[in-house]
């Protein structure tokens, strides 16, 4: 009889872990889909909306820990660097959103390149 609660506890941990990992993947999918929209659109309302979605996904993903860093302490250099990457990304998204709100599409397009550079740098480390 004692085995049932133990087994139930193990399964709930596994399910929670799988859900958490899916959430990080969902955030990454939101980021990449909306980056494509920002890259190709010239409509400031569409760009601003996509950037807001990107910002929310980045904030959510920043709280997660990718599989490559599982088991690392919260204050480890790797976790701090992972979260710093999202700080840089969010900062760049905010700058890009400001340019979109000002109607400066040329700066928006330049900024997309910087977002891609940040993504590539941190993907190579933690993906």
Swiss-Prot record:
Record bears the keyword Glycoprotein: no
InterPro entries found in the cross-reference section: Cyt_b562 (IPR009155), Cyt_c/b562 (IPR010980)
Signal peptide: 1-21
Parts forming coiled coils: none
Cofactor(s) of this protein: heme b
SUPFAM superfamilies (UniProt xref): Cytochromes
One GO term of the biological process aspect: electron transport chain
GO cellular component, one term: periplasmic space
Cofactor binding notes: Binds 1 heme b (iron(II)-protoporphyrin IX) group per molecule.
Binding site for heme b: 28, 123
Main localisation: periplasm
Entry's localization field: Periplasm
Gene Ontology MF annotations: electron transfer activity; heme binding; iron ion binding
Keywords: Electron transport, Heme, Iron, Metal-binding, Periplasm, Signal, Transport
Functional note: Electron-transport protein of unknown function.
Sequence similarity: Belongs to the cytochrome b562 family.
The name this protein goes by in its record: Probable soluble cytochrome b562 1
Gene transcribed to yield this protein: cybC1
């Amino acid at each position: 009889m004692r085995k049932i609660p133990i087994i139930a506890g193990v399964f709930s941990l596994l399910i929670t872990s799988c859900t958490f990992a899916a959430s990080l993947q969902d955030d990454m999918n939101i980021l990449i889909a909306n980056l494509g929209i920002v890259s190709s659109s010239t409509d400031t309302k569409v760009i601003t909306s996509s950037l807001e979605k990107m910002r929310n996904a980045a904030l959510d993903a920043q709280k997660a820990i990718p599989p490559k860093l599982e088991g690392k302490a919260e204050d480890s250099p790797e976790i701090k660097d992972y979260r710093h990457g999202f700080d840089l990304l969010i900062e760049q998204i905010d700058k890009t959103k400001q340019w979109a709100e000002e109607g400066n599409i040329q700066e928006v397009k330049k900024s997309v390149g910087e977002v891609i550079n940040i993504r590539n740098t941190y993907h190579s480390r933690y993906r």
